[in-house]
Each structure stands twice: as C-alpha cells, then as structure tokens.
C-alpha cells in the first residue's frame, strides 16, 4: 500500500482523487493549500507519491514548489502533477525531469492509471 499526498484546492476534485486513490488500496493525506501540504510534509512518515495541482491560491507558491520541498526530504519521491492550464513546452521539460502530468479534466480511470505509473525523479517506476 502506497502513501499518497494529494494537494488540490478544488474540494470536489480533491474528493474524487481521494476516492480513486483509496479505491486502489492506497492511503491518502489531503491538503487544500500549499500551507497544509507543507505541514503534512513535516510528518516524519514518508509519502510514496505526491499528486499536486500546479496552480494553487497561495501567490507565488504552487505544486512545483510543494514538490521541491517534498523532494528535499525524499529525493526519489514520485510526483504526478495536474492542471487545467495550457502546458507550454518549457513546462513539459519540467515534467520529463521531475514527474508526470495528468491534465484536467481527468477521469477516475485516467487518475488510476497515472497514479500507478508516475515515475520517481530517478526514473524508476513505482511498485504500488
């Protein structure tokens, strides 16, 4: 069973993601903001997958910054990003180097498939 940190400011999307990930047999920790996510990352227990929205309502901080903080603690953390924004070529490079991308809107089967294949920063496939 994997431990998954979900970071999403849209409550209905967060509830959907929690439901899908829990249905896959994984435990979830949920944060509706960067502040909540950073507080959860202070817990000594490590997470196996970070699923985070890129754009969060905390000004200059968002999913990339949450992932950066999380990877300071766990450099091999698997990261899955999501956004409803248009993805630029520059952003695509970031995903290749640091995680996978699941664009919004996504379906429950798409989330299930993506959460089972998000690579770590070292390119190792997870064994959830």
Locate predicted features.
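Conserved acidic carboxylate
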Residues: 8, 83
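Two-component/phosphorelay signaling modules centered on CheY-like receiver
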Residues: 11-29
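Acidic, metal-coordinating helix/loop segments flanking the phosphotransfer/catalytic sites
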Residues: 30-49, 57
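Conserved phosphotransfer cores of two-component systems
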Residues: 42-45, 69-77, 94
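Conserved phosphotransfer microenvironments
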Residues: 53-68
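Negatively charged, flexible loop motifs adjacent to catalytic sites
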Residues: 84-89
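As written
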Residues: 92-102
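C-terminal output helix
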Residues: 106-118, 123-128
């Amino acid at each position: 069973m994997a431990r998954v940190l979900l970071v999403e400011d849209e409550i209905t999307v967060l509830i959907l993601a929690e439901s899908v990930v829990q249905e896959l047999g994984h435990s979830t920790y949920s944060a509706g903001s960067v502040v909540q996510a950073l507080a959860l990352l202070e817990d000594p227990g490590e997470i196996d997958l970070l699923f985070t929205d890129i754009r969060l309502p905390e000004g200059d901080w968002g999913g990339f910054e949450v992932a950066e903080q999380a990877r300071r603690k766990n450099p091999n953390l698997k990261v899955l990003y999501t956004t409803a924004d248009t993805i630029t070529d520059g952003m695509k490079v970031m995903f290749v180097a640091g995680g996978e991308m699941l664009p919004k809107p996504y379906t429950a089967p798409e989330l299930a498939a993506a959460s089972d294949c998000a690579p770590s920063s070292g390119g190792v496939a997870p064994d959830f």
